[in-house]
Design a protein with these regions (language model features):
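Short, mixed-charge, low-aromatic patches
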Residues: 20-28, 43-48, 92-96, 125
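Conserved N-terminal alpha-helix of the aminotransferase class I/II PLP-enzyme fold
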Residues: 33, 38-89, 110-119
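Short intrinsically disordered, low-complexity coil segments enriched in acidic
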Residues: 1-4, 73, 155
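Short conserved active-site loop signatures built around small residues
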Residues: 1-29, 65
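Conserved PLP-enzyme active-site core in the AAT-like
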Residues: 10-16, 78-207
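Short, hydrophobic/aliphatic alpha-helical segments
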Residues: 6-10, 67-72, 196-198
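Glycine-rich, flexible loop/turn motifs
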Residues: 2, 7, 41-42, 51-54, ...
Length: 207
């Protein structure tokens, strides 16, 4: 079987023109809802026992191509409305409404502001390690109610490069997931999951 290269995957993965009237470019589906067919098929769709489209808030053919394309590049994907939505969705699910997130102060401004002003409203405490590449400092900052370690592979905007492999080892020693924002590096330069990261987030507008 021929293995497609990165440059081919980034423009072709997840899309079959034959499923879209032979359109060369991915169509933009603007509909909110979809014909469900008969009631039996509708029941299967709403029970998620059959793949298909019901309502665009849940799934949309255009978004599905994006998810499948990123999955081909980086191993898996869920597309959300923004990079900040991806960060929030990930961390709130990991923290389950409480606990602590361990991170670096070297972060994208939107993330840093959210950590300061929004996350405490959800019962989360954010702990900062001044040098995220200091293993002893990271270990010392982990507490019993720490739920995840979050880091940017290359911080925005000051370009601090995180030692993902070491951070993953420390996180896993303590039963924690490592979440990496890989926006600046992109999967072309770095695939954090290959170095031990558990979850990876991106802002598509920046790469």
């Amino acid at each position: 079987e021929t293995k497609l290269g990165f440059d081919t995957l980034k423009v072709r993965a997840g899309y079959n023109p034959g499923d879209h009237n032979q359109a060369v470019s991915v169509p933009i589906y603007q509909t909110a809802s979809y014909e469900l067919g008969d009631t039996e098929r509708a029941k299967r769709l709403f029970a998620f026992s059959e793949l298909g489209f019901v309502y665009s808030r849940m799934a949309n053919p255009t978004v599905t191509v994006l998810e499948q394309r990123v999955a081909a590049l980086d191993g898996g994907a869920v597309a959300l409305g923004s990079g900040m939505a991806a960060v929030t969705y990930t961390l709130l699910n990991l923290a389950e409404g409480g606990g602590r997130i361990l991170t670096s102060p070297q972060l994208y401004g939107g993330t840093f502001d959210s950590f300061k002003k929004i996350y405490p409203n959800f019962g989360l405490t954010i702990d900062y390690v001044p040098d995220i590449n200091d293993p002893d400092a990271v270990r010392a900052a982990i507490r019993p109610d720490t739920r995840a370690v979050y880091v940017e592979s290359i911080s925005n905007p000051n370009n601090v490069v995180a030692d993902i492999e070491t951070l993953a080892g420390i996180a896993h020693e303590n039963g924690l997931p490592l979440v990496v924002d890989n926006t600046l590096a992109t999967p072309y330069l770095l695939k954090p999951i290959q170095y031990g990261a558990d979850l990876v987030v991106y802002s598509a507008t920046k790469n």
